[in-house]
């Protein structure tokens, strides 16, 4: 098996503080990702909830691993199904957000790391384009909140 990551980055036309709020406020996160019980505190365990698919219950289990406002946020991202008994399709990954102020806004870099291929291939293929759309969703959520 090989380990791989999804990396998306974009300059958003907002300050780091506004983007940080979008990344760390439950209501804002629900607008661009999923309903959740997130709290920006290292060690906090939380869940994302979405529609179940196949053998997967629709719950992503997470824990805040690093939180350095308004620059860095990292959390574990675990879930998936091991209905086949092999555990190869279960996710045990991390998501890291890095915010860097630049002219005209903030450079946002998201790395979702730890996909073990080929076992996590279905999740990797589904999430790769999804994370790209998420950055636009964050920008929309910030604009709507203004």
Features from the language model and the residues they span:
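Intrinsic-disorder/low-complexity, polar/charged segments enriched in Ser/Thr/Lys/Arg/Asp/Glu/Gln
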Residues: 3-9, 45, 59, 72, ...
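A short beta-loop-alpha structural element at the N-terminal edge
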Residues: 10-16
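Hydrophobic-ligand binding "helix-grip"
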Residues: 34-40, 54-104, 113
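Conserved catalytic core of Hanks-type protein kinase domains
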Residues: 22-23, 67
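Short beta-edge strand/loop motif at the mouth of beta-sheet-based domains
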Residues: 7-8, 27-59
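A conserved amphipathic terminal alpha-helix motif
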Residues: 114-146
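Solvent-exposed alpha-helix faces
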Residues: 24-25, 136
